[in-house]
Amino acid sequence: MGFSAEQAKKDGKDQSPVSESSSVGGTSPATASSVVSPNEPKLSGKEAKALKKARKQASRRAKAEAAAANNPPGVSEEKKVAIPNKNSNQQKKASKQNPQNSPETDANLQEKKIFEEKQVSIFSHLDWRRRRTTENIPKDIHPAVIRLGLKLANYKIFGSNQRCIDLLKTFKIVIQDYQTPYGTTLSRHLTTHINSQIAYLVSTRPLSISMGNAIRFLKLEISVLDIDLTDDEGKELLLEKIDSYIRDRIIIAGQVIVQAATEKIQDGDVILTYLHSSTVNDVLIHAKNVGKKFRVVVVDSRPEFEGRVCLKLLTEHGIECTYVMISALSYIMQEVTKIFLGGHAMLSNGALYSRAGTSLISLLGHESNVPVIACCESYKFTERIQLDSLVYNELAPGDQLVNMGVDDFEEKPGVLANWKSVKNLKLLSLKYDVTPPRLITVCVCEMGLLPSTSVPAIINEFKQVYA
């Protein structure tokens, strides 16, 4: 079966690359065998494609052999040596520009290894890294932000209100010292500068929900600045907005809550409070100042013993107090008439997100028919929904559970001193838990006494005000 003239011409074109490659590096067996003779039958499309691919591979192999024969042996080795040097220089340059991307130190690697071995698998998704030193801090981080970050990392600031106020005051200093680069405007570049400060703070400790809401407010105010304003005018306007936020959403809101919650305290009440809440403390002190007679039960828990701060403050104002640990809660609950709790945040489904142990106290109060009153400012309300405290939480260092001393100045390691070297021993310290809305009798905010399920309505109302 013969070929036509057109088919022979087409085959000649297909064979031309093979002849060129064979002239460079010699004819390989694969190339020679791939030539189609006139007596062979016509190939299908799939077979022709495979044949063409084999010819290309043979051509590349022949060129590579020819190049290897022409180049001396030392050239390729020199190129191989030069490439790592180039990459190492790029890595050094990148590490100088951004110290966070520099190679990890032995201490960091050791800490990471220990954590991975001692990690509770169900909480492996939670961030555990904490920057507790000033090592490898980016050069654009403001000293005031570094100071705040170290305080947050070492748990020197108690309460979400105080953390938010300190954050906004720190950003006031950052804005005052900020200089707009040439070719940009304040409203366009300041947000980038603020983002780098926030990234450093997040590396020291996860931001609270109240801090996140305050940051969103600040970024919104920066974005709506008039582009025609001078830098000094824009800074002055931002500083006024920050002062207004602290005054209206935190301080005055707390004062309104104090007035509303005090009305719920009657003479002869036994009020139970947990750990240290600045809003609840203000409620109890104000009730004492207006002449109401009551007693307070301060419930505390390890490892930070924040309840001692509350106990000291209340006793200084002449309030009769009883101090118990959370393990004795069931014995003291029969005396309690009302429970006042502070809130880290109020979730959109009406749940209370607060310090670990709050849910236990609310449950015992609900079962004992004791009203549970949550005091929380509206700037802590969030659209987030949580059904448990597993998906989102904050991991505290396990070393906090080692010290068995009764105060911060007593070091008493106890049996957990060498817990990192004990096989199959893991320590878990969670900061927060979630109290379902059915356990909360009423939520007191600056809008009044409301059911906890009204959180979405309050959020929408404030969105319209600040839109």
Curated annotation (Swiss-Prot):
One matching Pfam family: IF-2B
Residues modified as Phosphoserine: S16, S19, S21, S23, S28, S37
GO biological process: cytoplasmic translational initiation
Region (Disordered): 1-106
Stretches with biased composition (Basic residues): 51-61
Keywords in alphabetical order: Cytoplasm, Initiation factor, Phosphoprotein, Protein biosynthesis
Protein name: Translation initiation factor eIF2B subunit delta
Organism: Schizosaccharomyces pombe (strain 972 / ATCC 24843)
